[in-house]
Amino acid sequence: MVFSEEQKAAIYYKDGPALVLAGPGSGKTTVIINRIERLIRMHNIEPSSILVITFTKAAAISMKQRFLSLVGDSYVSVTFGTFHAVFFNMLRQAYNYSAGSIITADTQYSFIRDAAISFELE
């Protein structure tokens, strides 16, 4: 694949986290997976220290599949996930939380409703 100068800059950047913003179909996923591959192979970055966060579960799964098809199964320790999944895993590991420990949407709504009613009465 031929990359633009902007894409090359993102792929070759190695000094810390990178935020890749671009429109649909612009090659973001390809750039990200090529950057990860380069970090591991050229800069000896430990795969388990790489975290890739996306907005949707489908995007995370797709990106991981595309990454593994590029590099093979030798780098399965790279973490791909959504914001929610990544932060839930942090809570689970740090505090032994389970899915039942997380407040439900109904409870959230009730709490906010009760707080709003209380605020209006005072």
Residue ranges: model-predicted function:
Residues 14, 75-77, 96-122:
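ATP-hydrolysis module of ASCE/P-loop NTPase motor domains
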Residues 1-98:
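P-loop NTPase Walker
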